[in-house]
Amino acid sequence: MKKIVVFTGAGVSADSGLATFRDSDGLWANYRIEDVCTPEALRDNRAQVVDFYNMRRREMLGKEPNAGHRAIAGLEECFDVEVITQNVDNLHERAGSSRVTHLHGELTKLRSSRDPESVSYTHLRAHE
C-alpha cells in the first residue's frame, strides 16, 4: 500500500470556524503571545494562561470537522496515511484520521510538570 503524508495547518480548521493566530481577527489580535504561550507566562500568571487554553478548548468542542478533514480521513480507504499538523485541535481525529502527529501538542491532552502522566484537561485548575 502506498504511503501518503499530509501536512496541515490553521487553514484546514479555520474552515470549521476555529480562530487562527495571525489573521486580522485571530487569537494574536486579542492576546500577546508573551502573555499566554511562554514558560514565563505560565510561571507568572498561571490563571491567565489556563483561562486562555480553556477558552480554546471550549471553542474547539463546539466545532465539527469540515470537508477537508473528512477528505483527508477518507484517503485511509486506499492509502497508508500519516497526518502531520500544526493544529492543536482534534478535528482530524474526529473526522476519522487514525494516525495524526501534532507538532505543537494537543488541547485535549496535558502533561503535568510535576507528574509525567498525561491528565485530562477537564481536571486542570489555575492553582495546579
Where are the language model's segments positioned?
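Conserved catalytic-core helix/loop/strand module for nucleotide-ribose chemistry
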Residues: 2, 12-113
